[in-house]
């Protein structure tokens, strides 16, 4: 009672001291539910409209057939000749069996889908049965168990059992808790004390200032760093095992601690023995996980380890596509440690990852399984300085140059002898590091650029495992890094990626071709057999048979890849994660900010924007800077003034101050994210010197200028020491950074694409977090920030491409500019109905308070706060309600809208229930899918039988495996997709048992022989024209004029472009087409 009274008194005191304004508190749950229902209804209505249009076309076609039948019937009744009567009867019979029955079946299928869509609209498109932990509608038991981490992607149940041979062991909850505590103690003992040896200088940020907003570290920057390394040979500071003495000391310490001084009768080394107090978990007689690791894994992580072993047994790889924060790194390390513990790790392991997480990989290996030798192949690695005995003098260099081949060294090499000597010394260190790992084991860590630079050395090695972290970097099948990765000599390949399927089948092919070369055939075969039917089935004007064929091909493709892709999300498996609350805190403008804002709204610059004479983004950027801090506008002239960045001129900074002081009293740690270093500079001065009230707060800072070598140390300090706030840029918070020491997050200037901010959120709300996490996005009420944010809420459900596709120029329309470039209208909602709905549920958020929640009444009364609104991420909410089947099919079909256009799985099944064997459409859709799979199998056999591992698969431009030398390349290119569609036509003719010469009357049908011949002739004309041009180049207009093709609609443009792409490449710089080399021969046709 006394504690409760003290808490209440503290709340009253805070309210009295902070209370300025009363504001609206808006419920996140009601806002999400209302908008989600609105947009789902909108999407269903759009799908319903497409289906009704398709139904109308089918009814029109039916009426034509009926009229024709009636006409033939009248002629039959009026004629007297027996031969004519028989001919008319045959025509009527064929018309009824081939055309009328087919259209009637189309109408029946379409009406079934329309009925389902209308039911969803009538019910408000409520997602029933999508509660966490429950099986969802349309989901099989196997899909449910895979999604929740109960079974592997191959359908096998968790098969680990505790190895209790020769010991008494009770498998109960109490014993499990003891195992967990002992394993945790073992992990603590495994930690190194390297951070204690770092000086304060390691944590000082660079004083260099940049004119540009922070940009994500790219490959070119890392490439320059590694190229410099080859000549400078700067010693690294990371405590990896490139220093053999360090590894031996660490190994000796671990052996001593783990054995606990007990007598061991076995002759096996310590890493092969079970823990003296924690039993191993064995899957079979060969594969065991060390007890101290197994005890710390979540159930779904144990399932992943078993799945990786199943892949190992099949001599192939897989993709771990778990959502960010579920411990993909730990699952891989646990598996490799189990291989080592079981005596199955007989070769080296290569880890390829972004430079920012190399040290984290090293730390995690040393933490979870210390006996593994882990070496970083980078300037930060200690191996670059571990052997200074090798020094080349001038005489050695001169002898080497004189005795070498002329092509080995140039005159410049001899002239710049110092640089050449350092390069050779550095190369010696690299060779020695690689040889050490290959000879003695175990782990070599490098970057994607490092793999490319040192490919001459790394591609020669026979690796037991190759792991690509952030493996979607190889999604472009023709990029140099993709081809390099696919040359690695190992069958055991693992990709880690939180976004393995991103609505692009070609990218999906590239990833799978790495983990299982040839599984999906060559890229041209894959595109012909799957991409074309799936894409055609997604068109709004697709016929019923095209819709079903596309869906069945997607299902067939899903069945091919699903065993090798493991994808789980937090909502399904991480039941023990604490609650997360996301809110938008709307701040007020200061008087100075308001005057600056209005000044721009009345400026000539805005007039130019509204008249289309200036880029819209120019004005938006100015207003966003004003919302953050108006001094950013005149940074070049004011940054040296003492009052630059004055916190009193920023409403957001005043809110930040009160939040940090409030959380400091409560003992909470906070992460403060902003998008640019300029704003981060202002915030750092604000906390360190500009405001005396904040001077007692301890903080750290990390941005793009922070040396990669020191980033992990900063993270460890923040998690383990008494810091109040960590200042970070949104991007550098980055991949794999674990900041679970914080349970409060402020995103100072949210990105317009909310998914970008998810990286920042996941730093704290992830496995290992024990407390409730609150995330606050700061926006200025009534400003351009709020206006765009509320537009996003609705548009987010319609399509994700608006924000991610640079070709979408229509996001900002001219007629919207007046509303965007205004101040006020703080409601921000698109409809009054939505506003009333939110107001009605205002109290919901207040009632959701827990012991670790912030007092929302207190927050909205902070000085400078206009209102509090729960953050809405509709995409994430809807994603959590999907089955794994939905996610995979959606990715294959190219997005959610296409999935809804095609139909749900239930709709396909139900619409064909009870249909007879004469259902031509269903049979042909299935046949196309089966033939597509068979084509892949045939292509795969050619790849796997004829080529060794490490031979890149033919992509149509690069690669060797599976490439077919064509005698008639033009002809073969033509028959690819046409063959698929032609088979359906052929089967329809067989089903009617009589050949028919009549085309399908609705004009949207599959390829006929006439169309194929027309396309062949067009292609030959295009090739002949380009053959005569200079450099085989011509513009699109010239090509069309020369061959006399008329384009009547968009479909004609798509067809001609598709034909052009088969024999020519588009040159973006010259804006025209260049004929492929294989068609430049006069005999190519």
Swiss-Prot record:
Motif (DEGH box) on chain: 469-472
Subcellular location: Nucleus
Record protein name field: DNA repair and recombination protein RAD26
Acidic residues composition-biased segments: 210-219
Statement: the UniProt record of this protein carries the keyword Nucleotide-binding: yes
Broad enzyme group: hydrolase
Lineage: Eukaryota, Fungi, Dikarya, Ascomycota, Saccharomycotina
Record organism: Saccharomyces cerevisiae (strain ATCC 204508 / S288c)
Covalent S-S links between cysteines: none
EC identifiers of the protein: 3.6.4.12
Gene3D superfamilies, alphabetized: P-loop containing nucleotide triphosphate hydrolases (3.40.50.300), Tandem AAA-ATPase domain (3.40.50.10810)
Top-level taxonomic group: Eukaryota
């Amino acid at each position: 009672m006394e504690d409760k009274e003290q808490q209440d008194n503290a709340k009253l005191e805070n309210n009295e001291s902070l209370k300025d304004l009363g504001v609206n508190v808006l419920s996140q749950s009601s806002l999400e539910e209302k908008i989600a229902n609105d947009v789902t209804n909108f999407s269903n209505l759009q799908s319903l409209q497409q289906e009704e249009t398709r139904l109308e076309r089918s009814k029109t076609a039916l009426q034509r057939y009926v009229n024709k039948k009636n006409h033939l019937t009248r002629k039959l009744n009026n004629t007297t000749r027996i031969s004519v009567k028989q001919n008319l009867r045959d025509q009527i019979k064929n018309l009824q069996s081939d055309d009328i029955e087919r259209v009637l079946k189309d109408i029946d299928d379409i009406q079934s889908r329309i009925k389902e869509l209308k039911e969803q609209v009538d019910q408000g498109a409520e997602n029933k049965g999508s509660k966490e932990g429950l099986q969802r509608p349309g989901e099989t038991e196997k899909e449910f168990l895979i999604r929740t981490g109960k079974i592997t992607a191959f359908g096998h149940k968790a098969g680990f059992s505790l190895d209790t041979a020769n010991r008494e062991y009770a498998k109960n909850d109490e014993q499990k808790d003891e195992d967990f505590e002992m394993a945790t103690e073992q992990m603590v003992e495994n930690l190194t004390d390297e951070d204690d040896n770092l000086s304060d200088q390691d944590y000082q940020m660079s004083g260099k200032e940049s004119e540009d907003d922070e940009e994500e570290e790219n490959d070119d920057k890392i490439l320059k760093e590694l190229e410099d390394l080859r000549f400078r040979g700067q010693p690294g500071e990371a405590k990896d095992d490139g220093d053999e003495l360090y590894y031996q000391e660490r190994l000796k310490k671990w052996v001593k601690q783990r054995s606990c001084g007990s007598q061991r009768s076995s002759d096996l080394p310590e890493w092969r023995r079970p823990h003296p107090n924690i039993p191993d978990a064995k899957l079979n007689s060969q594969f065991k996980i060390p007890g101290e690791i197994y005890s710390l894994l979540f159930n779904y992580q144990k399932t992943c380890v078993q799945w990786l072993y199943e892949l190992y047994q099949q001599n192939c790889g897989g993709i771990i596509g778990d959502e960010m924060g579920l411990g993909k790194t730990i699952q891989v390390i646990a598996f490799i440690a189990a291989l080592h513990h079981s005596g199955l790790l007989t070769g080296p392991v290569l880890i390829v990852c972004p430079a920012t997480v190399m040290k984290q990989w090293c730390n995690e290996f040393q933490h979870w399984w210390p006996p593994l030798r882990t070496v970083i192949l980078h300037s930060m690695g200690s191996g670059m300085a571990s052997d200074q005995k090798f020094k080349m003098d001038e005489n050695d260099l001169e002898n080497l140059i004189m005795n070498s081949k002329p092509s080995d060294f140039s005159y410049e090499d001899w002239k710049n002898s110092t640089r050449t000597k350092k390069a050779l010394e550095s190369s010696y260190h690299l060779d020695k590091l690689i040889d050490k790992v290959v000879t003695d084991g175990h782990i070599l860590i490098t970057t994607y650029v490092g793999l490319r630079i040192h490919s001459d050395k790394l591609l020669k090695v026979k690796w037991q495992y190759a792991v690509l972290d952030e493996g979607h970097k190889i999604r472009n099948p023709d990029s140099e890094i993709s081809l390099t990765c696919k040359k690695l000599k190992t069958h055991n390949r693992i990709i880690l990626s939180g976004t393995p399927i991103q609505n692009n089948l070609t990218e999906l092919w590239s990833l799978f071709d790495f983990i299982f070369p040839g599984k999906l055939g060559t890229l041209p075969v894959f595109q012909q057999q799957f991409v074309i039917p799936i894409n055609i089935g997604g068109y709004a004007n697709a016929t019923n048979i095209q819709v079903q064929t596309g869906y069945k091909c997607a299902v067939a493709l899903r069945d091919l890849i699903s065993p090798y892709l493991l994808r789980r999300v937090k909502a399904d498996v991480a039941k023990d994660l604490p609650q997360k609350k996301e809110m938008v805190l709307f701040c007020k403008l200061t008087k100075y900010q308001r005057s600056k804002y209005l000044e721009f709204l009345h400026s000539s610059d805005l007039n130019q924007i509204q008249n289309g004479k200036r880029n819209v983004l120019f004005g938006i950027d100015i207003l966003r800077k004003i919302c953050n801090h108006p001094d950013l506008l005149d940074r070049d002239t004011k940054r040296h003034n003492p009052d630059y960045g004055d916190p009193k001129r920023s409403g957001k900074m005043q809110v930040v101050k009160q939040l940090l002081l409030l959380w400091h009293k409560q003992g909470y740690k906070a992460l403060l994210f902003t998008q640019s270093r300029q704003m981060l500079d202002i915030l750092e001065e604000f906390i360190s010197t500009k405001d005396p009230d904040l001077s007692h707060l301890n903080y750290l800072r990390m941005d793009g200028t922070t040396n990669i070598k020191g980033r992990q140390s900063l993270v460890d300090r923040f998690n383990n020491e008494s810091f109040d706030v960590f200042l970070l840029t949104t991007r550098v918070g980055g991949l794999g950074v674990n900041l679970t020491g914080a349970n409060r997050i402020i995103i100072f200037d949210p990105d317009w694409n909310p998914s970008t901010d998810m990286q920042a959120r996941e730093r704290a709300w992830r496995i290992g977090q024990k407390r409730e996490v609150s995330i606050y996005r700061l926006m200025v009420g009534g400003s351009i920030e709020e206006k765009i944010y509320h537009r996003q809420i609705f548009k987010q459900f319609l399509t994700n491409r608006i924000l991610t596709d640079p070709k979408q120029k229509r996001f900002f329309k001219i007629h919207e500019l007046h509303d965007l470039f205004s101040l006020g209208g703080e409601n921000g909602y698109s409809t009054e109905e939505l506003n009333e709905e939110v107001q009605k549920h205002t109290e919901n958020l207040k009632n959701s308070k827990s012991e670790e929640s912030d007092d929302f009444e207190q927050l909205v009364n902070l000085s400078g706060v206009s209102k509090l609104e729960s953050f809405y991420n509709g995409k994430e909410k809807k994603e959590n309600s999907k089955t794994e089947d939905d996610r995979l099919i959606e990715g294959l079909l190219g997005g959610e809208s296409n999935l809804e256009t095609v139909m749900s799985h239930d709709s396909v099944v139900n619409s064909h229930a009870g249909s007879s064997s004469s259902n031509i459409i269903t049979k042909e859709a299935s046949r196309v899918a089966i033939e597509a799979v068979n084509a892949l199998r045939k292509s795969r056999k050619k790849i796997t039988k004829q080529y060794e591992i490490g031979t890149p698969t033919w992509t149509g431009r690069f690669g060797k495996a599976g490439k077919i030398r064509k005698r008639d390349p033009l002809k073969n290119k033509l028959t690819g997709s046409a063959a698929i569609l032609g088979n359906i036509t052929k089967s329809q003719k067989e089903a009617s048992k009589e050949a028919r010469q009549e085309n399908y009357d609705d004009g949207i049908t599959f390829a006929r022989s006439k169309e194929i011949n027309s396309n062949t002739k067009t292609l030959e004309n295009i090739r002949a024209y380009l053959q005569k041009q200079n450099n085989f180049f011509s513009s699109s207009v010239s090509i069309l004029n020369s061959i006399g093709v008329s384009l009547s609609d968009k479909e004609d443009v798509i067809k001609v472009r598709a034909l052009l792409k088969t024999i020519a490449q588009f040159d973006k710089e010259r804006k025209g087409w260049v004929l492929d080399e294989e068609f430049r021969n006069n005999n190519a046709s």
